[in-house]
Amino acid sequence: MQYWQLNVSEGNAAFASNQFARAALHYRAGLDELLSIERFIHCDSPPPKAWIIDQYLPALIVSYLNLCDSKLAQNKIESACELLEIGYQTALNFATSFVQKSDFQLQNSALRHLSQLKKYAFLLAKQLANKPSSLLKLNTIINTHTIINHNIH
């Protein structure tokens, strides 16, 4: 098991035990590890694009979602919304840099993965209708139109 996967597993165990702060620490460590892997993806001999889009991007997205969940469980709503906004922008920038020169199947896969963050933002926005500052962050995600959308359509 890779270091980031171990942290996700330990974070999940902590979350299941209602130890949300501890879960957040594990999720953050796993996310940081994934973000450090990105430099290998941008090197002279990167892994295959299919692995990047079908393995790395979903892991990155799930890591942000796990961290957001742990922040919400601690009632740190602003922090969760900020993380979701950062996560969406990070995943979007990352995906866009790879899929512009990819085939339709990889573009579609990347868009499907990114839609998970948008879906999460929609669900969270419904719950936070009375928190305008949080809604602003979520609306940034909800209203983003990506280059990937334009390439596919």
Residue ranges and their predicted role:
Residues N7, L57, Y64, L111-L114, ...:
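TPR repeat positional signature
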